[in-house]
């Protein structure tokens, strides 16, 4: 009995000594896995490689004997995946409605369909990135995914700009715009938009990345600082153009309201309320776009790869919300989209509102 007790005490002493040696080794400089990503792994748009450092697409996740990943899932990655799922579901519905309803194939709804398609691809990209990051970690797949996401979000922002231009022209040249605008012209505009977006997405895949030179990495790996600066500058230009056009739209709306007031010798309350509502809607549209993307675009310029990864997550996640809100602003508020929804979910519904092509300012 005494011998077994002594052996037990001796084993406990050895265990304590081993734990002390491990703690000393850690204090002396053993690598730390960090709290914002899986052990020995970091992923762009996914778990950062520690509390400090940019998000990285390359992931080397530890696997167990059976090949299953044993690393903990980053909660930020889960939020991005959930956001992508909601985005994909909403925009898939919009794309299906426009594609299946002949009355919604006008130039205006083609622009809305382009926006919904871009956001749908962005949502699918967020989901696939989560899957590949934790199931099939690979630098090649990571480059493809970041290129896919860059192209999708670039197409989304470009489609928003195209819709803004369409709104402005429809109000500024109201008498001649609809007779000149054709589906072919809209398709050519969107073809140019998607070509530029695809080109931006292909740049990392074609070699403009920081996999070979980690010192050139931005806050989102494997994108280089120069590439991120180009994307941010492009966004600022697009945002500036949209801001200018929306200010001009407000001026046109108020001028029309003033002309009505002169004709009627007073501004009738219904016209005043409609004008204020229209201006308020434009403010919400532009404010939502700016609040979603500006923080991430600014941080991409001023941030560095040594900054905590949580900063990138905290600015990137709201940017994805813009693709979640776009269907509500540009599609589900439209009466024809609402009627198509009723017909989809309740075929017996008979709406008294006839199909007609609403002006882009009403979308």
Curated annotation (Swiss-Prot):
Membrane topology term: Multi-pass membrane protein
Deleted gene: phenotype: Deficient mice show reduced striatal cyclic AMP production and selective alterations in instrumental conditioning.
Keywords, ordered alphabetically: Cell membrane, G-protein coupled receptor, Glycoprotein, Lipoprotein, Membrane, Palmitate, Phosphoprotein, Receptor, Transducer, Transmembrane, Transmembrane helix
A single GO BP: positive regulation of cytosolic calcium ion concentration
Subcellular location: Cell membrane
Annotated glycan sites: 2, 9, 52
Positions where lipid (S-palmitoyl cysteine) attaches: 346
Family, per entry: Belongs to the G-protein coupled receptor 1 family.
Full protein name: G-protein coupled receptor 6
Higher taxonomy: Eukaryota, Metazoa, Chordata, Craniata, Vertebrata
